[in-house]
A protein has these predicted regions:
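A short amphipathic helical element positioned immediately N-terminal to and/or at the very start
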Residues: 1-2
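Short, strongly hydrophobic transmembrane alpha-helices
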Residues: 7-31
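Hydrophobic, regular-secondary-structure patches
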Residues: 22, 26-100, 107-110, 124, ...
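A hydrophobic alpha-helix feature that marks transmembrane segments and, especially
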Residues: 22-26, 296-305
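Beta-strand-rich non-transmembrane domains
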Residues: 92-97, 118-129, 152-175
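Short beta-strand boundary microenvironments
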Residues: 98-146
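Mechanotransmission and gating elements of multispan inner-membrane complexes involved in transport
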Residues: 160-161, 169-296
Length: 305
């Protein structure tokens, strides 16, 4: 008798699970669709290097790990020079303690309607503003520090992690911005190794630092200290190498001045010769959701069988 009761209870549980699973899956998909589409619809255009449009959109909107092919600041300058849209460059390549570091400009905060809940906004290179969830999970507040994670911890010759000063915490926005660490573009370029600060060689008398020293030129060796923290004391020593127009980014938002300008801007990227693409995030995410719903229909059919 006891065995029959257990068998009956197990059968009822299985039937209940089978009946509930499609409903639970539908609720999950509906919530995911709302979250994905709301952010995509609010973002008019994304510009990036040709490749996977989905990778470009997912990294730019949701800061996922899959980094698209990189573009350059020259591509951003072309958008600005067109006078058809406001470019908002984004460099979302690096992480800090598992959260994406998003290098951008102050226009991003205005565009997303992000507000500071505690502390202040970005003002200097090396500063960071944290999304609400990041601050809560890592238990950080203005005045604390957050160190960037190396791309490859086993690369001993790689770029040193940067110790960033936390200066502000964003109010909760219920979006992927809550899960991001925001910094100035120059900060992310320093993390990438395009800029650095070091001891003043002209004032330093330590002979062990020099490979060669003449009246005109100074060549330092590996003993020269590279700063991994930016402060008021060493801020002036930080400088960048190379052509700024060739500095790399993961993408740029493009906010048209009006619908007609948006159409004209898209037309400039139709040519097959250009290495840059411009996409409408809503179209890309809608295509992704259609594929997901097709898979869901297959699962429903299997459950029914």
């Amino acid at each position: 008798v006891c065995f029959n009761k257990i068998k009956t209870a197990t059968l009822i549980a299985c039937i209940t699970l089978i009946a509930f699973l499609p409903l639970a899956l539908q609720l999950l998909l509906d919530e995911s669709e709302q979250q994905l589409m709301s952010r995509a619809v609010s973002t008019p255009l994304i510009v990036g290097t040709k490749g996977s449009a989905l990778d470009l959109v997912m990294n730019t909107l949701y800061f996922v790990d899959e980094v698209p092919e990189l573009m350059t600041m020259a591509d951003v300058d072309r958008i600005e020079d067109s006078h058809l849209a406001l470019p908002i460059p984004i460099h979302a390549k690096f992480q800090a303690r598992g959260y994406p570091i998003v290098g951008t400009t102050m226009d991003y905060f205005d565009f997303r309607g992000l507000a500071i809940a505690n502390g202040r906004s970005l003002a200097l290179v090396g500063e960071a503003v944290l999304g609400a969830t990041v601050a809560n999970e890592l238990e950080l507040k203005p005045g604390d520090f957050l160190v960037s994670s190396p791309e490859n911890p086993f690369d001993l010759a790689g770029v040193y992690p940067l110790k960033m000063h936390v200066v502000g915490i964003l109010a909760k926005s219920h979006s992927s911005d809550d899960l991001a660490v925001f910094a100035d573009l120059k900060t992310t370029w320093i993390i990438e190794g395009l800029g650095h600060g070091h001891q003043d060689l002209l004032k330093n008398q330590d002979a062990s630092l020099f490979l060669d020293r003449t009246k005109k030129d100074i060549t330092a060796n590996a003993k020269l200290r590279l700063y991994t923290e930016i402060s008021e004391i060493n801020l002036d020593s930080f400088h960048f190498h190379g052509d700024r127009s060739q500095y790399r980014l993961t993408a740029s938002l493009a906010v048209p001045t009006d619908p007609k300008s948006g159409t004209l801007l898209r037309g400039r990227y139709v040519s097959q010769e250009t290495l840059i693409q411009i996409v409408q995030p809503a179209e890309v995410i809608d295509g992704l959701l259609q594929n997901i719903f097709q898979i869901k229909n297959v699962i429903d059919a299997i459950i029914v069988l």
